[in-house]
Amino acid sequence: MKVLTIHDLKIIKKRAEGTLLLREESNETVATQCCGLALGTEHLQILICGGTGCKASDSHIIAERLQQALERNNIADKVDIITTGCFGFCEKGPIVKIIPDNTFYTQVVPDDADEIVGEHIIGGRKIERLLYIDPKTEKTVSDSKHMDFYRKQMRIALRNCGFIDPENIEEYIALDGYMALADSLLHKKPEEVIDVIKRSGLRG
């Protein structure tokens, strides 16, 4: 579809919003639970970090192994595998995140794929050995939202990293991608654009 107007962007946005809706951060009650086909979860997503560090540690092979495991179990139509941008926690990569319960698995290797599919995706049981261990409490933390490393951050420019597929333009548009550009080109004079940038406080 060729995008010529803001209306065109809104059509794409509406079409892609449903996919991203499943990735919305869960509330605290849901975050302590687990999803899985055996528990009645109708559809799941597996987010895999595709950043440089994780890819160097075989995250792309993990994605392939997960896809193969889904196909062997005849559930590939119930689970989407999505390669995202960097989660920002390279020390703990490769990172795999299960949606909708937001379980955050760290230092995953290709040989973990069958267990992730069998135990978590199908069985609805979190894999304790792959969960992040808080260095202060020495307790496992299953949701990145409750990790000190992330809790103290407020991402702005990088807020979509680890959330969308950087190679899927529709996912970017679903989060209002290009809306500001379209507004500037179609509705604002050059002087107004300059004024907005000045008032924004952006530098560099």
Give the positions of each predicted feature.
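Feature of Fe-S/electron-transfer and energy-metabolism proteins
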Residues: 1-204
